[in-house]
Amino acid sequence: MDSKTLQTLRRDAEDICRSAIEASVPDAAIQRALAQLPPCQGRTVLVSIGKAGWQTAKAAYDALGSTIEQGVVVTKYGHSQGPIGDLAIYEAGHPVPDEHSVRATEAALAAVSGLSARDRVLFLVSGGGSALFERPLVPLAELEDITGQMLVCGADITQINTIRKRLSGVKGGRFAQLCAPAHVYAILLSDVIGDPPDMIASGPAYPDSTTTAQAMALVSRYGLTLSPQALDLLEQEPPKVLDNVTTVITGSVAQLCRDAAARAEALGYRTCLLTDRLQCEAREAGRFLSAMAGTHAGKGEKTAYILGGETVVHLTGHGLGGRNQELALAAAEGLAGLEAVVASVGSDGTDGPTDAAGGITDGATADALTALGISIDQTLADNDAYHALKACGGLVVTGPTGTNVNDITVLLV
């Protein structure tokens, strides 16, 4: 195992991930979508929500300027980059909604109230909107608790949103109803595999496609504890038809993977897209990739295996980390001694409740951790990948990126 080769592979893996994320920043795509809008005879109100909420609002404001009469931006703490004209900018809680989420949402609802059929709402949506944009129909403390239960049990984003859209006064198409009779032009940056519009930020402006039976089955499957009030709400169907909405999707994990492949090819790698629909336990994905490395490493041809999607973590410990860090750490043992690297990075720059976007490990990581007295198995059991990767230089830190289109994972051999 050559250390210089590993250094090159690590550098290239980070380069591929960072380049793909930079290419997915939505400015140009948002402006292209806005250019297709029909003329507005009345007022234009902007509402932009999500972890990319500031970036998408800035792109829209740069394109439309003073034609936007009023606007509200809701993004995650630390993701605002300053004023945008006279738009009202709020930061709020993610992945669990908080009182700032509710306050910001009420400001948005005030902005769209009383509009006429001549007016329009530009609704810019990115991942994270489910927590950031909220009018709870149960006490906020209970909604926070239910969200926490689903995050801990390993439910995927579609399952989580199936539950929480029924507990909200703005999700599942209800925001669009509150905008009526104004027309809503929804421009979506997708962070949900397969790009189902009703699941992106829990579909505030899209008809619901789920059923009460599905929601109740999730309660049973995961043993969720809900109040009688919440259970009653699960029995109520969100809107199934909306006649005042036009929806466009401008970015997705599929494009993120294509951009990663293009950068890998530019660096001289043969590329193989394994999937842009990765959905499984993070550590199982990491172990699978290390097994692939065992088969393909050292065969002569430089190859980049690319995956996109969103893994899950079933929390059993009380450590610190995120799904991308856990994936990378889980790969480390199987990579030992190989000229191979696994990098996994969240496109929004945030992986779990940490300051890292993801993690990177290689054929030397396992020995480095052993020398530090760190057990990979115990660390995974504790869900403490952050501290292990930090100790061996395996964290990938980008800061907020201005986009959010799932995660990018790369295996280089």
Where are these regions (language model features)?
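Internal helix-turn-beta structural module
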Residues: L329-V413
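Accessory alpha-helical/coil subdomains and C-terminal extensions
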Residues: A182-Y185, P207-F288, M292
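Glycine-rich oxoanion-binding loops at beta->alpha junctions
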Residues: V74-A117, Q159, R164
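Proline/glycine-rich low-complexity loops and linkers
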Residues: E91, V96-H100, L151-C179, D351-T379, ...
